[in-house]
Amino acid sequence: FLEEAARELGLRNVDVRWGRAEDLAREPGLRDGFDLVTARAVAEMATLVELCLPFARPGAGALVAAKGPGPGDEVARAAAAIEALGGAAPKVVPVDSFSGDGQRFTAVVVQKASPTPNKYPRRAGLPNKRPLA
């Protein structure tokens, strides 16, 4: 789907990769390589930052995670994980649904302040089974 969407939209600077984030985050050019990393309906915030933040460029990159209308407790539980992975304090931004149905959700924005330690992400499956928070 993603390859076809990029082709239909005429996007040229798109590289679709298949694999687990735990493995891909160790590849040169992918780790610390992106200004923006997005995720929607993937996992709790503590797991999500371990899977996604290693891809963001330190000092310039960010993770933007789509969450439901009240992610405060989930974000608070992830505070230690965010710090351990090199993230700055998260910002929760209310967003209107693009579907026009009047639903609201939030975008949780985590700036990448410093490099993620090399021990993260942990091996496949561990971030979900044993979140850092």
Specify the residue positions occupied by each region the protein language model found.
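S-adenosylmethionine
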Residues: 1-133
